Amino acid sequence: MKKIMFNDKYGLTQAVLEGRKTQTRRIADTAGRLRDITVRQALEEVNKGRACLFDEGRPLALSAYKLGETIAIAQKYADLAYEGEFFRLLGKVIFEKGCHNKMFVKADFMPHRIRITHIRVERLQDISEEDCIAEGVWRDDNVGLEGTTYWYHGLANSSFRTPQQAYASLIDRISGKGTWESNPYVFVYDFELID
C-alpha cells in the first residue's frame, strides 16, 4: 500500500481527517519538456486508472495514484498516541525514524486511509472556487462589512478576498515561492476518507 502526506503546518492532515479537505493537487514532473501537450487517461493495461500527460504522442508524466486506489494517510507515530493507535505499535515504533517524521512511517501501520474517486490534469491556476474549498481553504462569512473572506490554517491575522488568492498563498508556502506564478500542470485527485 502507498502512503500520501499532507502538510501539518497548515493543518491539511487534520482537514482530511475532519472531512474538510477532499482534494489534492500534485505537480506533474514535466521538467520543461513540453512541446505539444495532450492529456488523456492511460490506456495501457499496466497503467489503467491513471491520468497521463502526453507530449508529441509520448507519455511524459503519469499520475502517482490510480482511480479507486486506497492510500494510507501518513501521520507521525507520536501523533497516533492521541488516537489510541500508539499502544498498538508501541514495541515496534518507539525508536524508529517515523516517530517524529511521517516521511519514514510504514503505510501498513497508518489507521486512516483515503480512496481516489477522480483524477484529472489541469494547470494550477485553473482551480475553481469550489476546488479551493475542497483543498482546505476556509470560507468566512462573519467578517462584518468586508463581506466574505478566505483563509487557511497556520496563517495568523491574514485573509484573502477570493479563495484562489488564499490557495495561491497556501501552495507557495507548501511548494515554494513562485509555484503559483509558474502555473505548472498538476494531477488533481478527488478522494474520500474511508476509515
Task: Describe these PLM feature segments.
Residues M1-D195:
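Secondary-structure transition motif
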